[in-house]
Amino acid sequence: ARPIMLLENESRVVDDGLANIILSKEEESIKAYASELVKIRNGKEDYETCLKNMHTRPYYGAMMIKLKDVDSAVGGLIYSTADILRAAFKCIGAKPAIKTISSVIVMHKDDEQLIFTDPSTVQKPSAEQLVDIAANAISFANMMNMNSLGAFLTYSTNNSGKGENPDLVREAVKIATERGLNVINGEMQFDSAYDLNVRKAKFPSAVQKEAGVFIFPNLESCNIGCKIAQRMGKYGAVGAILQGVNGAINDFSRGATVADVIDVTSITILNGYTFK
């Protein structure tokens, strides 16, 4: 891989051996990319709006991926997750046959690796969207040779609780089972999903195998769960890693460590090879 650093102006250039693209010197390519984005947006945004967006690194990098000028891109230390996601959605879009773009975070400690989804993309998914999110995460787990058994989470285990979220999650489990996804046959609280002894006591009819993919009922709960695992459980977090986008682009938290940046970049480069 040949890394390229996107910079707004020359004042941010660091002599670190990387190739640099200085946006303030790329007016011709910015105009060309903006014209392409107008075509992609198909009347939803005019040229002036696209040109303004293309002067930012998220949009310029996303368009480089779209036009195959680079294989992959990462960002997020300065720009927000929303900035990266908007650029990815508008410039690149979803893979063919993908209805829902989502994200995963790999939580890791010692030899343990778990996938949490969806921490950054779909705020309040429907049952169908939740199944799409699960399918995306399971596919990612398989690509990474990780445990891909999925567990749908809520505050109910095997019909023990009632309410909007348990009902939605039960519907998602039903749809996922009908679609043949590799998931445990019922909704669960986190303790039942994570601890086989608890699951055996609370839900003896469920699959008694360790789950590797934890599907939260909404973005809020997943995001909170990731932060609790990081800060109180001392888990490392790699991501968020976008799923379902028709190109290799990812975002890391503005609080990311050097190790986080290296991990997300490595996964993004690996993902880039799948689009060649």
Whereabouts are the PLM-identified features?
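Anion-binding alpha/beta catalytic cores of soluble intermediary-metabolism enzymes, centered on
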Residues: 1-4, 8-276
